[in-house]
Amino acid sequence: MKSLALALLVGGAIASGPQQQVLREPVDDPQAAETPLQKISDIFGHLSEQAGNVWEDVMDKFPDTLMDAITQTPPPKKHNRRPDSQWDHIVRGSDVQAVWVEGDAGEKHRKVGGRLDTYDLRVKAVDPSNLGIDTVKQYSGYLDDNENDKHLFYWFFESRNDPKNDPVVLWLNGGPGCSSLTGLFLELGPSSITKQLKVKYNEFSWNSNASVIFLDQPVNVGYSYSSSSVSNTQAAGKDVYALLTLFFEQFPEYSQQDFHIAGESYAGHYIPVFASEIMSHSHRNINLKSILVGNGLTDPLSQYPHYRPMACGEGGYPAVLSSSSCQAMDNALPRCLAMIQACYNTESRWSCVPASIYCNNALIGPYQRSGMNPYDVRSKCEGGNLCYTQLDDISKYLNQDAVMESLGAEVSSYESCNMDINRNFLFQGDWMQPYMRVVPTLLTQMPVLIYAGDADFICNWLGNKAWTEALEYPGHDEFAAAEMKNLTSLNHEDMKVIGQVKSAGNFTFMRLFGGGHMVPMDQPEASLEFFNRWLGGEWSAKSP
């Protein structure tokens, strides 16, 4: 959930902030006399003349608050590590890494690839009766990267149906920097949280026919913590690979089932990269069969041109913005696309950060200032930067001592989104990176589903359809030419149409009617149906 959370703040800040002086009055202290551009150069390294010109231009509208955002270092999250005796299982990555096996041809190789010796996995068997979230078997705990003092929290729910045979799914929320426990309690998990902080059973939970792992990543998100940080998608992928490898080592009974990665929003960055990391290891215990990305940000160059149409009445819903605002967005688009293209060409922070700042201000800022919900064009923002008051209820629930004790949480407090992480990813240039470039290889290895609720603005269905049709890969022409067909529910006698779908080879795009940024929250029954049908192989959910 919540892709572009900081981007909205950046867009609004630039648009509403006063014009800043790039050069300040002379002072005696040379350090104090540095221009903002020089300070950024000190942080990022050498600045080329071309990049400097771009930054000078962008920083004409760069408020002091953003300079503070670049340079500030957040304090580590307060935590209290529990003794090993309080955990039911501890898997040592060094032990797993030391295991060698013999191949069919007699050659010896490590049982699983990748560097694991710095990692441990701690596991707590959660008593279902303590919290009442679900009656199924549950595990929670931490992946520890001892070398870098990183600790990722996870919560596993077994399938309600047939856990010995049902697939296993990893769920990831976005942000970057938002907890996947938001997905658990607001969208697709076994229960939601009421305003009275009581649990309410969800009959349309995605663990109806699959076991689901909810992971708080990267570090310092949700119950996760670290004295260090992760500020790019590729680094986060190493941690996720280690967690899954050690989890399936501890629980081999789940490692034989099909495994899928699903998520939304900034997970459009995460999931292709994480899947690529997994598949890069020829010897692995992760039986990855497909990926699913909902309302994701994956190819900004193809997606950003569709902010204006979605905000201005061309996405299936009434216009939110005035004609003058729409024209201003049109006017800004060519420069935005040129800056994104420069980011694609260099994959450098110097090019990618200005592209994020300029484009988010020009194309997202106008919508943010409208007061409408960027995650659902049908409603106003309810308050706060993330527009959903339910997030406060979830945070209050997860901050209760009894809940934290039941789960083995080690942090002093829980927050749904960590804006420090969001900022770090933005200013590392991760935002505009062309991560769709790894998708063509994935399509040779597994089916890929891109789905989108059609009422979302921030990662809208128009942009997601556009990038799937623009993707350069051998099956491009066949997919681009495929028709959008009605997606009809099989659960209703009246053959209710719940969306549209197009599919060719291993690539599928799906539009879900009446869903916002969080489809499982807005359309719980329809989301569970398409999820089950995807896992069942109706489209391409069988590996070639």
Curated annotation (Swiss-Prot):
Q: Where does the signal sequence lie?
A: 1-17
Does the record carry Transmembrane helix as a key word? Answer: no
Enzyme Commission number, as recorded: 3.4.16.5
Key words of the record: Carboxypeptidase, Disulfide bond, Glycoprotein, Hydrolase, Protease, Signal, Vacuole, Zymogen
Give me the glycosylation sites of this protein: 209, 506
Enzyme class, one word? Answer: hydrolase
Reply yes or no: does the keyword Hydrolase apply: yes
GO MF terms held by the record = serine-type carboxypeptidase activity
Q: Which domain of life is it from?
A: Eukaryota
Q: Which family does it belong to?
A: Belongs to the peptidase S10 family.
Role this protein plays: Vacuolar carboxypeptidase involved in degradation of small peptides. Digests preferentially peptides containing an aliphatic or hydrophobic residue in P1' position, as well as methionine, leucine or phenylalanine in P1 position of ester substrate.
UniProt protein name: Carboxypeptidase Y homolog A
Q: Which organism is it from?
A: Ajellomyces capsulatus (strain G186AR / H82 / ATCC MYA-2454 / RMSCC 2432)
